[in-house]
Design a protein with these regions (language model features):
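Short, charged, solvent-exposed linker or helix-capping segments at domain edges/interfaces
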Residues: 145-147
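Long, hydrophobic N-terminal alpha-helical segment
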Residues: 1-65
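Helix-turn-helix/homeodomain-like alpha-helical modules used for DNA recognition
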Residues: 63-143
């Protein structure tokens, strides 16, 4: 048994029960974005959160322990994503990455945007030309240290 097995079980039960990530997150007491990332194997849950997820998804004690193991983050099955939605993000970074970097450096100086001290919010906005996906990424700016 490993973390991937638990992720597969969570997805299987979610589909079978017709659950929504937002409802799961509400029970865990965290954002839907963070809980979804965790359930998909990208975050570490604490004991209390793992217990709640165990109740929701029918996970036994050993399976709940796997939710508390630090995962190998950013582990996609291929170097270049093949899923169309994930590929669009890859494409956006390829097209706009240098622009984002330039504008962040112009505003903040030489450094990076943290993906650790970070939050994300995904919302739907109605639009007569087709609903829009709004994604807000908020990461702490970390300047490079001079030494």
């Amino acid at each position: 048994m490993n973390r991937n097995d638990i992720t597969e079980k969570i997805i299987t039960v979610k589909v079978a029960k017709g659950l929504k990530w937002e409802d799961v997150a509400r029970q865990v007491g965290m954002s839907k974005e963070w809980v979804t990332a965790g359930c998909l194997g990208q975050m570490t849950f604490d004991d209390k959160q793992a217990t709640v997820l165990g109740e929701i998804f029918g996970l036994d004690a050993e399976e709940q322990k796997w939710l508390q193991v630090v995962p190998y983050k950013g582990s996609l099955p291929t170097q270049v994503p093949t899923d169309p939605l994930i590929y669009r993000w890859y494409e956006m970074v390829n097209v706009y990455g240098t622009t984002i970097k330039e504008l962040i450096h112009e505003e903040f100086g030489d450094g990076i945007m943290s993906a650790i001290d970070f939050s994300m919010d995904i919302q739907r906005t109605a639009d007569p030309k087709g609903d829009r996906v709004n994604v807000l990424l908020s990461g702490k700016f970390l300047p490079y240290k001079q030494y």
